[in-house]
Regions:
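P-loop NTPase motor domains
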Residues: 202-203, 207-213, 242-468, 475
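Conserved catalytic network of the ASCE P-loop NTPase/AAA+ motor domain
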Residues: 161-162, 192-196, 235-237, 391-392, ...
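Conserved beta-strand position immediately N-terminal to the Walker
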Residues: 168-169, 400, 481
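Glycine-rich phosphate-binding loop of nucleotide-binding enzymes
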Residues: 143-242, 492
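Basic- and hydrophobic-enriched, low-structure N-terminal and domain-boundary segments
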Residues: 1-173, 186, 193-197, 436-438
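Short secondary-structure boundary/capping segments
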Residues: 74, 214-228, 258-260, 457-461, ...
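Conserved nucleotide-binding/hydrolysis micro-motifs of P-loop NTPases
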Residues: 30, 62-64, 102-105, 206-210, ...
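Conserved ATP-driven motor cores of ASCE-family P-loop NTPases powering translocation/secretion/packaging/pilus
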Residues: 464-521
Length: 521
């Protein structure tokens, strides 16, 4: 192994010895280094022949002098004279504290005092980080060290999208953390490297941010394009994208309530890539038990995910909907309202008061235009969510716009998509072949809205479904990529099942709440 320039030597003292996992070293005065730089350190070989190398990542830097205290420095400056020049400079050096990552001969003994410290080379850094010999590398970015080396960092696909491990979480404050930007970079990497294996579903949760991802960016500078090339990727827009917008009775807006510019939607319609999703009664209320539409009754509970229901009375009402004969939402609301007068007889009796509460909620929460019937005419371009998922294939992307919807409808649509994909992977839909979907990656921002850390004594329906996805989805091929501002606001089991965590810029309040940030302290 080629010998590099020596930049310092290990120091082990009585009060701060080296250990199996940590090491201290002083630096040559002309060396510039920073936290997260990687170095290699000479170590014993184990068999007495030659030497081995340990690799460490710098965690903290400190400068120490022979001064007994700050007051001594004050006195040495002629008792506080800021213009005084010292006769002799104090003896001092920079001390680096580093965490040991490993050894090229698997030596786990503490590093000896006086051991030579050198810059680690690019190949050594990749090997120390465990990304040197990946079976299917997915570019995750690159790092630049203080000695101007640039090293590409990859993920192993088997641990990012399964089947060995799966799910990713991105956290950081709004705007500055670039959560969505990094997620889009990673999804582009998946599409470029695994076009025959991975399909993608995105949720647009704010403004028109993700409603033109198949269009080239006009703001991408040459320097940014070079950064893509350093990662081994082409700085190109995503391909094979279909957009689902919330249906609305607004012909002048292409029958949608989306915030996307009208000219953008019209261009997508011309290319047959834009549709308006809606919910009809039959699909939503469910059919007979055992029918594939029976899951609709489960999804209806998402409408009330923010309503306290300790006695599960609303769930009981929902389960009775399959017996109601109704072809339109008006008819369904009318049939439910009829039950508020007489209730139900028999062993499954539901109190009239419960039906009245349920009727009131159904009436107020199904007035949005998205609750509709299929209208004739191509101009409306209506499509059920399940039909859009049936058409999903590896290499394709489905963008679902939920930004203009109120929170309870956002939870409904998000949960509907998650449950439909999960059930399709369980072969609960006769019309969907689970192998045709490939491995489905679902990306959602503001994950804390759907899986909050505190939901009372009982997790709500959507949270339970997300827990099922993160706990069982890896083996089925359903992968969740989530992002949020505050990691501490996410359900602990959802976080615990994520094999990959990405940390963006955050604030001191979040640092004090989320235990995971102790890794960086």
């Amino acid at each position: 192994m080629m010998e590099q320039k020596c930049i310092g030597k290990v120091t082990a003292t009585e009060s701060k010895p080296t250990t199996c996992t940590s090491v201290y070293f002083w630096l040559s005065p002309d060396v510039i280094i920073r936290p997260f730089d990687l170095v290699r350190i000479e170590h014993i070989s184990g068999d007495g022949s030659g030497k081995s190398y340990s690799y460490a990542i710098v965690r903290e830097l400190s400068y120490i002098t022979d001064s007994a205290g700050h007051l001594a420095n004050y006195v040495s400056s002629d008792f506080g004279d800021i213009t005084a020049q010292p006769m002799n400079e104090r003896l001092g050096t920079t001390i680096a504290e580093a965490d040991v990552l490993g050894n090229n001969r698997n030596i786990e003994m503490p590093i000896r005092d006086g051991a030579r410290v050198e810059w680690a080379g690019p190949d050594e850094i990749r090997d120390a980080l465990g990304v040197a010999n990946l079976q299917q590398p997915i570019p995750g970015g690159y790092i630049q060290t203080s000695n101007k080396e640039e090293i590409r960092i990859d993920f192993e696909a088997r641990y990012l999208v399964g089947p060995e491990a799966a799910h990713m979480n991105i956290s950081g404050i709004s705007g500055l953390a670039s959560k969505t930007s990094y997620a889009m970079f990673l999804l582009s990497a998946l599409q470029q490297r695994m076009p025959n294996d991975v399909s993608i579903i995105l949720f647009n949760v704010k403004g028109p941010d993700l409603l033109a991802i198949d269009q080239p960016s006009t703001s991408l500078s040459d320097a940014q394009k070079d950064e893509w090339h350093k990662c081994g990727l082409d700085p190109e827009p995503l391909e094979n994208v279909t957009y689902l917008y919330p249906y609305a009775k607004r012909q002048e807006r292409c029958f949608t309530s989306s915030h996307a510019p009208k000219d953008v939607i019209e261009a997508q319609i011309q290319q047959d890539r834009a549709f308006n999703y809606y919910y009809d009664v039959e699909t939503f209320k469910g059919g007979e038990a055992g029918n594939e539409t029976d899951v609709g009754r489960d999804k209806m509970s998402l409408l009330f995910s923010d309503i306290d229901d300790p006695q599960s009375t609303m769930e009981s009402c929902i389960q009775e909907l399959g017996d109601i004969q109704a072809e339109t939402w008006d008819k369904l609301r009318e049939e439910i309202r009829a039950k508020t007068a007489k209730g139900q007889a028999g062993p499954k009796e539901i109190p009239v008061q419960s039906w009245r509460k349920f009727s009131r909620l159904i009436r107020t929460r199904t007035t949005h235009d998205v609750f509709s019937s299929l209208w004739p005419g191509e101009g409306r371009r209506q499509k059920l969510v399940v039909d859009a998922i049936k058409e999903l294939r590896p290499g394709k992307i489905l963008v679902v716009d939920i930004a203009p919807l109120p929170d309870y409808l956002q939870c409904l649509v998000f949960g509907d998509v998650i449950r439909t994909v999960f059930d399709a992977k369980l072969d609960l839909y006769e019309s969907i072949n689970r192998e045709d979907l490939g491995r489905v990656v679902v990306f959602a921002d503001e994950l804390n809205k759907y899986a909050p850390s505190s939901t009372g004594s009982r997790d709500r329906t959507l949270t339970r479904w997300l827990l099922e996805v993160t706990e069982r989805g890896r083996s089925l091929g359903v992968v969740l990529f989530g992002a949020e501002q505050f990691r501490s606001g996410i359900h602990s089991r959802v976080l615990g099942n994520c094999s990959t965590d990405v940390f963006g810029r955050t604030n001191p309040v979040e640092l004090s709440k989320a235990a995971d940030y102790k890794l960086f302290s």
